[in-house]
Design a protein with these regions (language model features):
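A glycine/proline-hinged amphipathic helix-loop "lid/cap" segment
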Residues: 1-69, 308-312
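Short beta-strand element of the alpha/beta-hydrolase
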Residues: 74-84
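Active-site glycine-rich loops that stabilize anionic/oxyanionic intermediates
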Residues: 82-88, 249
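Alpha/beta-hydrolase fold nucleophile elbow
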Residues: 143-156
Length: 312
């Protein structure tokens, strides 16, 4: 069963499902997503410094936010891509999560926005993620010590972008120490046992995600492209070591497990973590489900140890 603190939300979702995204405007959905994310996240961790900035990538500029924790060890910079089904999300929706992870890991976090659908369809978000990874790798001294480890992280849709960017740049000598994939979505047509069991009533409605994939892909019809469906990569040799976090009652659970297995198949070191009794998006629900904070702390502990070992 789901965690007792989550039961009221799951029951409510089953009794009164969220309106189908086609019935609301994109701006309305984004505003609602932002308001709800900030509300359920709760109080923010204080930081030594929070610096809003921009990353110029030739023909486009992306908003960024650097989080510097009070006990920053200067050993790593975590580049973070937010979730939101490729349609929603921004620096505000994941501000509290980045702050807590920065505090718990003693690492700097750099959250970066990317172009969203439907205004910008595939491969705009992927191009942004890849270009941001390359830019930050080349300019890491602007954000942290030049010799610091670089980690690429994301949740949900952001985890898909983190996975793709890590895979596509794996032979470019960027010095990416790790990729951290938090309940990743890994394709528009992935069918698994968990996608059947938890397709509806567990806070992520699978048909809503499928709808957003259609918004994201636009006229792009090749779903076997690994940039769309990372599970289709035919070689991941040399990809950065990975931490993959999945939630027990998430329709995306099994595809996250499958991607961890695919990475391992190609010789990549993987730590697979499963959050029991949890649902998709639980990491951002600290205000109402305090048990989620323990999982955030556990993830941070794994990441901190991961970096310590990689630097020795």
């Amino acid at each position: 069963v789901v965690h007792p603190a989550l039961e009221p939300y799951v029951r409510a979702a089953q009794v009164r499902p969220e309106p189908h995204p086609a019935t609301r405007s994109t701006s309305e959905r984004r505003n609602s997503f932002r308001s709800e994310a900030v509300f359920v996240a709760g109080a923010s961790q204080p930081m030594q410094d929070v610096i809003d900035g921009e990353i110029a990538l030739g023909d486009r500029t992306l908003a960024s936010r650097l989080f510097v924790p009070f006990d920053d060890e200067g050993k790593a910079l975590v580049l973070f891509f937010h979730g939101g089904c490729f349609v929603m999300g921004d620096l505000e929706t994941h501000d509290a999560l980045c702050r807590r992870l920065a505090t718990d890991t003693h690492m700097r976090f750099l959250a970066v926005e990317y172009r969203l659908a439907p205004e910008h369809t595939f491969p705009a978000a992927v191009d942004d993620a890849v270009d941001v990874v390359k830019y930050v790798a080349a300019h890491r001294g602007e954000y942290v010590r030049p010799d610091a480890a670089l980690i690429v992280m994301g949740d949900s849709a952001g985890a898909s972008l983190a996975a793709v960017a890590s895979a596509l740049t794996r032979h470019e000598g960027l010095g990416i120490a790790a990729q951290v994939l938090i309940y990743p979505t890994l394709g528009p047509e992935v069918v698994t046992e968990s996608s059947h069991k938890y397709a509806t009533g567990y806070l992520l409605e699978l048909d809503h995600l499928r709808y957003d994939y259609r918004q994201y892909l636009g006229d792009w019809s090749d779903h076997t492209d690994p940039r769309v469906t990372p599970l289709m990569f035919d070689d991941l040799t040399g990809a950065p070591p990975a931490i993959v976090l999945v939630a027990q009652f998430d329709p995306l659970r099994d595809e996250g497990v499958a991607y961890a297995g695919l990475l391992e198949h190609f010789g990549v070191s993987v730590e697979l973590l499963e959050a029991e009794q949890m649902v998709h998006g639980f990491l951002e629900m600290g205000a109402f489900v305090p048990a989620t904070l323990a999982v955030v702390d556990d993830l941070a502990e794994h990441l901190h140890r991961f970096v310590q070992e990689s630097l020795t």
